[in-house]
């Protein structure tokens, strides 16, 4: 899951951005990866300005979450910390474009890279 705004950020060069978009499209074509884009028009992004990683291992291990930005990441491994993080990720998933819509958006962005 990534924001549309992130897709517009040229870091390095347009060639780097083109490679990143191609890589995301390749990942989205895999059966074991889901790529979703949160459109810039979506209000109230629950993780705006920070990263969020959630890991759910089922019965094998407790759920964990990482939250971070430019400072050291915060690691959550207890239910009282992970529950809000998983709720935020669920909400983000609801707000994001479908995987199919995201492929269309990524393709449009790729065509627009100068």
Model-derived segments and spans:
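Hydrophobic protein-protein interaction segments
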Residues: 1-114
